[in-house]
């Protein structure tokens, strides 16, 4: 795609031809400029020093903005950065899975697990939280290439790569390696703490050197007893108690509102009183009615022969009234008796019904609720007692080991007849001790966490000695049978530790490895005070005297 003219060119109407690409291993025209006739030739046609480290996640973002142009140079890295001397590879800032994981967890260890769909996920941990990313096939292949033992545990080693890129190496337990090395160097102590008065380094004639090694171990143990509230049986018991209390309350409310009320005392009437009252009332009523009819009265005849009512009822009328009044009294008596019986029956029926309801509600409500309360209380008590007797202790022990090395080296005079054969050894050991002094090892009885041994190393990035692999040196020393006995001297003589063995074995084989790998050179702590190289010193005849390893 042509680029328009943005300047005040007289040929402003013409288009500027596209710029030639800077090809990498993949031709620039094939990446985005399909159909371009521009070939990758010319002065900028060769970029052999740079090649893509891997398929970057950012390659698909803007590589097709301008067809024919090369990949962004930030996505190109030196081919030699893929594998370094530490047996790892470099992680670019390409927003890929490993770059994202390193951003999240920093310089720490992570593991690789196979997911259900067949993909591989890198899982790290930070502040007790797991961070998981899905690896690309290229990253998984790179991790497999350095993980020869198939541990699937790796570690970010900080910005030790080019341009501050982090490195990925296979994780190893540095505490276990240190214990094995100390057990080899000091069999009597079995890898324990080394006494301060033992100097395992040789001091040459004509030099005054005092070395004091101190190992300070700090152990912090925190024990947390799990609470009984974490036991689900305890909460079941508490729930039973709460349900029982709720049942008691519901039963009381139901008995107060929903049950048959307590009946009142039955109202009774005296039958005799009722009969007398009815007889008297009936007699009065019939007498009044009888007086209304004059024929019912007796008649008196005066002197003139006239019939005059006497105001008295006839005898037969009086007898009828008395008979009817008596019958009315008997009826009233019978009604009073029946009324009393019905009232008593109603009272008894209501009282019996209430008693049945009370017994039923009390048996179900109060009985069940009380049973729940008792069962919950017993369950809570038993659970608490068993928890106190068999409570699991969540114990976490963290041990931090710091090694502090202090060295004071006096004058080194070749004219005094001595060759300081341990100057390189001191320099190498000091370098390793200084790295070990800031590397902390944490372990726990409930965790298999492997802490990165290179995460906090503050060595110079461009220092050649800081980039030398040291694990194989420790393994050589620990596995060498000649480097197994330490002789201690006491008295007025200098404190030196001499290693029993033959020249070329033990620590001298370590010197040879360092010399062959470029670790010992002139001006960096050679084996001789002169200009001989480390190789010539190793191959030369042993120097008689206390400097020699006999």
UniProtKB/Swiss-Prot annotation:
PTM field: Phosphorylated on Tyr-474 by host kinases. Tyr-454 can also be phosphorylated, although at lower efficiency. Phosphorylation is stimulated by clustering of Tir by intimin.
Record's subcellular location: Secreted; Host cell membrane
Positions of transmembrane segments: 234-254, 363-383
UniProt motif (Essential for NCK-independent actin pedestal formation) ranges: 452-454
Bias kind Low complexity: ranges: 1-13, 395-409
Keyword Nucleus in annotation: no
GO molecular function: lipid binding; SH2 domain binding
A Pfam entry, by short name: Tir_receptor_M
KW Phosphoprotein (keyword) present: yes
Extracellular side, ranges: 255-362
This protein's UniProt keywords: Host cell membrane, Host membrane, Membrane, Phosphoprotein, Receptor, Secreted, Transmembrane, Transmembrane helix, Virulence
InterPro entries: Tir_central_sf, Transloc_intimin_rcpt, Transloc_intimin_rcpt_C, Transloc_intimin_rcpt_cen_dom, Transloc_intimin_rcpt_N
Location of Phosphotyrosine modifications: 454, 474
Mutation effect (residue 474 to F): Loss of phosphorylation and strong decrease in actin polymerization. Lack of pedestal formation
Compositional bias annotation for Polar residues: 218-228, 336-345, 435-449
Membrane protein topology class: Multi-pass membrane protein
Cytoplasmic side: 1-233, 384-550
Record family assignment: Belongs to the Tir receptor family.
NCBIfam families named among the record's database cross-references: transloc_TIR
Oligomeric form and interacting partners: Interacts with intimin. Interacts with host proteins NCK1, NCK2, alpha-actinin and BAIAP2.
Protein name per Swiss-Prot or TrEMBL: Translocated intimin receptor Tir
Protein's gene: tir
